[in-house]
Amino acid sequence: MTKMLKRVLQDVLSQEENEQLISAFDQIGDIIIVRIPDSLVSKKQIIGKTLLEQVSTANSVFYQSSPVEGDFRTRKLEVIAGEDKTQTEYKENGCRFIVDVEKAFFSPRLSTERERIAGLVKDGEVIINMFGGVGMFSLLAAKNTPCTVYNIDLNPVAAQLCKENVQINKLKGQVISLNGDATKVINEQLVGKADRVLMLLPERSDEFLDSALNGLKDKGIIHYYSHMHADKKQDAGKLSEEHFMSVNKTNAEIITSRNVRPVGPRFYQTVVDVKISKN
């Protein structure tokens, strides 16, 4: 959407200003979120007004004024056009989700990875989603295949939205929303229960690896996400495999690895799918 953003704004920004737009915008339901470089923050109102006029399905435009940060993985947003409301409905692959784009973590840029994971799940699996947010990965997996998913999140807003999304999608009993620290929840309730564990907190995966292993059955699978620096895009997956093997202390078999998305110049979010043998 970077090219689309530049095209939409070409009549309200100078050519020099237009070239400074370095990021695409995200549309989540009827909300647009745009990142604006510091050099163009003074133009944020006209940018918001123009986006609202040009994108017919949008009712709100927000400027993202901080990165995603903190234990709750939230960001600061400032309304620059339209309605000042951060909750919306988002649809993906047959599921409906209520999301709050400021109070709970959510990214539309992970839809391909969500679809991939849902396609891997087998009938009857028990899954632990350690940093599950509003339940996107969890509900899509359960909608696709009969399974049980424990969706853990530290953020009480995310956990409550997950409960609402379970009701909306008629998946009560298949997706269980648990509010708390993933390590504590696993150690107290879920030791050795999971056929599959999702670790969707790439910047802190090393810290939580032992907890993921505690929740896993013998021959279970971990989806281990990380951020990797690579001069060549095609090298990032292999580097992530090497990194996992350097921090893992168990008998592990790499199934596959892949780039999920770029997150910065020569930085990539990657995932390694690993089978763990405990015995």
Predicted regions and their residues:
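SAM-dependent transferase fold signal centered on methyltransferase-like domains
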Residues: 1-279
